[in-house]
């Protein structure tokens, strides 16, 4: 157990941040709190009202949906059903029980439903059960059927009105267009063509003159000319318009929208009303109304979701003014990729939309039942069918693109997954259609979405990560905080701005020098204006200032020290690879961190945090009991060796002692990849940058045997194996120790039930759970059944279908879970018993494993050298890792070099003398002028240790036990060759780098096969490790053997080793009997080819050398003939392993 020590770091930061990093899971938790309308949300609403803020929506998500759907009326309007006051009962099972028993963590939802008979005025009220509603765990995840899932927030185009400009290639004219995009309903599009006429498209149909629409809305020509007469484009349009009255215009629109149907004035009027002015059919949503009001400077109430006549007229006015080039400051086109025009659909909204969908389906059922049931007998319960609601929620969590299997490789992976922003998914973009502009970094992303962290590959730029300080406002727009500047002085006020609000202001950066009173230290300040333009201006023109230098990057990127010295492409890889790092046997916090580690570990939720202050009363490896100051006790259970979604090991261990005083919010137990409450993804290793015999060519890595022996980079991986016993047509399967034709030693580790004991060492092919399945072709007669019942089961024929350890896997059994119908466990239909076995492996580091630093510097281990052969320092310390210096210059990730030097300084400790140099003064000012050996340091992104400070500190490091300082200001040491003891001719850069072991382990990739499964049609071996397939011998490999004239090897590869079915059986027997291998026959794929050609009516025949047609019999005949001749039982499948052979 680790000693309780505080995780303090000496920070090289020069800027004091005015704002704490916010709760990193707020994106998920606050959204879900709003959806279900719980107490936490109610408190936030009250706080916002008291402080006169409007940053919290005041109606909960479910309340909104029930209000929208109420009342449901029947077709005549004589009856109605309305919903109000939803409430949740406590969940039936805890999160842990749900994970254990494959259940969904959910709470029952109840709603008060009122049925009103409008003719008699009678009201019947009932509380109705609306299904189990999945709940979010405190960590921001959902447990669905026992697995943890995350709902990713979606980036979509906001509803509103958008103006665009295109240039006509022929005439070189500016063509303007405009779209009014609702949250749901028909699109309305306006456009001005090259002949300067203004057109309109309704619901993506054919273009018409815009004046037709205005006339249909009741405007006459005089009124149109009075409002738009100054614009030539509108006059031209009016001249070309052939309609004379409102009726003509309505009929004209109807013909375009419903071609082929007979138009009448009433139907045309209704159609237009329904398209844009009926709340049931058209909804801009609150956000759409907000955007329309803002763009067109209207004052329409926020709850008006339909279009108004004013909206249409102002939109036409805007587009013709754009075309005429009037007032360009106030009339401008929109940029669709701007973050003011893209919004987030967070978890709450995504689930709310599903509930809305389910309720809409339910509404149809209710209406039908109202008409079919007897009015007297109707109660709310008889009308409501909750199936569609439950089904749509279930469908969303089970199959939606945005409900994802949680990435639990390490805590950072989980945290990042919850903060992910995706432009994909239903209603979003698709990979194929997304162009370059959507994916590119935009100036409005600053402080909202990280410009660095995004996947490499087809999803680049479509999936991002929320920036550290960003938050989401009630409309779904991402806001970022700024410090208010008034009259050239920074105030204590902090404002959260959306991207379009920010565009109206001038912002200074966080590292702008300030005086003690908050005024700017320099007479010119570097600022950012609209569109990311940069300039120097006087301090009194500045409106805002960034709150922190790490404001623009995400959590993972903010954990890369010296990020400012890395090329962005490599920083991207560094951010992504931190998420693939495997929890090691012993975690170790980085010597060189960024100050973000503790916060990230705490918010990720894999550490145990004390809820109230008190004293540790009792603790063991499994629990910690704290006696709180108010006299109450609380026991915190710790997770021991649990399997994560990715097969890594989740294990928590206490970091406090009995009797220790603990405060609320203090970390009392470490989880995976945490050390003393700090994120610890890798190990601090001594690295030398030098080529070594060509073994570290092209990013290969050389390691010391010490890392293998001392388990420095060893990790535990847990695999889950499962088997179920079902009812079959021939009788039930049985889990038993009594397996036919199996030697007793194979069953030695099975208990009396036939299940492996905990602690057993298992290797490929070992039986984990014994199971037999009845075999035979006939159903049993009642007489036979009776005989069986009397004389026992022994007589019947069964086959062995036991659960065995798959190929390439081995380890120790650490857990067994048995579920059976008899014990009352819920199991799928037809399953009587289910057994799960957990097998743990300790994987030492080995050649072929992938290692990486935090700067995108990755490589595969090529050679593990004995410690005595490794290069060593003058005091005899052998280095742990040898990296190739050629990997640094062209990749431009110099951060790794600075980390190497600062890592050495932190490991050896330092003492700065009392000199008057600037860097010494600076370090004294921030209390970083001295530190003992092994001190952890923080160098925050964009505000870290400077080059001159590192150079100075290298000179000021403490001497070793021999009194020597092995590395000077150059950062290089004299290294000695471990094999000869001779010094290398040049000094070598040596220091400590934080190295991560990634999930790409060679054990999971290496694969070999002797015999195994074959493809049904071609009879060739399957491909890939998952199918236990063979190695593909492709056409280029065939050319190689042809070139060498290796005819016999080639013949074997293409026939008996692949798909010559008869030959395979013959060779198998020849090997068993020790005879010579017979001649190969005809490959199955050749027969398939001939059949394909014959199916195309090409008569292909095989002729002998003298021209006689040879008949090729079907595969089945050949095989069975051969099998009969050879006496081989072919009723079983092909052997799939050496053991079976």
Swiss-Prot record:
One of its GO terms (cellular component) is DNA-directed RNA polymerase complex. Keywords: DNA-directed RNA polymerase, Nucleotidyltransferase, Transcription, Transferase. One of its GO terms (molecular function) is ribonucleoside binding. Its EC number is 2.7.7.6. GO terms for biological process: DNA-templated transcription. It catalyses: RNA(n) + a ribonucleoside 5'-triphosphate = RNA(n+1) + diphosphate. Disulfide bonds: none annotated. It comes from the Bacteria. Gene3D superfamilies: 2.40.50.100, 2.40.50.150, 3.90.1100.10, DNA-directed RNA polymerase, beta subunit, external 1 domain (2.30.150.10), DNA-directed RNA polymerase, subunit 2, domain 6 (2.40.270.10), RNA polymerase alpha subunit dimerisation domain (3.90.1800.10), RNA polymerase Rpb2, domain 2 (3.90.1110.10). SUPFAM superfamilies: beta and beta-prime subunits of DNA dependent RNA-polymerase (SSF64484). PROSITE patterns: RNA_POL_BETA (PS01166). DNA-dependent RNA polymerase catalyzes the transcription of DNA into RNA using the four ribonucleoside triphosphates as substrates. Belongs to the RNA polymerase beta chain family. The RNAP catalytic core consists of 2 alpha, 1 beta, 1 beta' and 1 omega subunit. When a sigma factor is associated with the core the holoenzyme is formed, which can initiate transcription. This is DNA-directed RNA polymerase subunit beta. The lineage of its organism: Bacteria, Bacillati, Actinomycetota, Actinomycetes, Frankiales.
